[in-house]
Amino acid sequence: ERYRPSHVLILSGDHIYKMDYSLFASYHQEKEADVTISLLEVGTELAHQFGVAEVDEEFRILGFQEKPKEAPKTVPGDPSHVLASMGIYLFRTETLMEVLTSGDEADFGTDIIPHLLNSHRIYAYPYRQQNKIEDYIYVTLPDGERQLRLEPHTRDSAYWRDVGDLDAYWNANMDLTGVEPYFNLYGQRWPLHTYQTAAPPAKFVFATERSDGFRVGKALDSLVAPGCIVSGIVRNSVLSPNAIVRSWAQVDESVIMDSVVVGRHCKIKKAIIDKHNIIPPKTTIGYNPSEDRKRFTVTPRGIVVIPKRFFKEEE
């Protein structure tokens, strides 16, 4: 009320995506909508995880089911997919204020959207069709060379992840590690800014490779933050600031949080290790599910989760 905006954009805080909100707003205005909801196609087997919209040929929303357990409304002409809510809403301010002052309704999918369907113009925004991220990215040519090219519709234009559980969080981190990642942090036109830790550059030590191959500090297909010191091998992983991977240690497909020390000869695979863990030498994590479950949380996908300060002292 203080700023008197004509529209209000409502977002969720646990989703990862790149979205040109100006395209979203233009679509909303073209439809003369009171509310526009960004939706994406997902398989019907996932419908129970989302709010699901029923639409007509013009993408006007006719019905809305909140996490249907059976018989979800499918995409017209495609019975194997549904249109799932991304938790991104654009409201005319008048419409939003009308809802907020009319009663105790609080949940968008259960209360607010169904309440508005019969009296307001509510439209679906087909995210993967309409969202376009234009950016310079490196592409691999047929001869193997890498070239910087302006792409009018990058691959991550269609990317969206809800990281509300540990498996999804791990998946989202792994999406960053590829040579051509599913979600690109390095675009020139769409850079992602974050808090920078006051730490020195990452350091990779022991340059003379030994017969066992593991004394050399190196990270492959990985993201390594400032302050890290690596003298083991890191593959397909994300290292947060000030992490240390000691000699002969191996870290694969893992997310290592701030100030974690991975001791010598450790073997870690498919793990999320929270802050300030000092992992003793020769510790093995992620290779024996039954043993891991005795000590740690193991997700449905088999990701081992080590809580903060579980390992407190280096032996």
Language-model features, listed with the residues they occupy:
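Glycine-rich phosphate-binding loop signature in dinucleotide/nucleotide-binding domains
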Residues: 2-5
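Short aromatic/hydrophobic "clamp" motif used to bind/position activated sugar donors
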Residues: 8
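A secondary-structure boundary/capping signal
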Residues: 11-12, 92
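Short acidic donor-binding/metal-coordinating loop in glycosyltransferase active sites
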Residues: 12-13, 21
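Acidic active-site catalytic centers that drive phospho-/nucleotidyl reactions
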Residues: 14, 56, 162
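Conserved core of the sugar-phosphate nucleotidyltransferase
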Residues: 18-90, 102-104, 117-120
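Alpha-helical scaffold elements adjacent to nucleotide-binding pockets in ATP/GTP-utilizing enzyme cores
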Residues: 23-27, 95, 112
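Left-handed beta-helix
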Residues: 94, 101-315
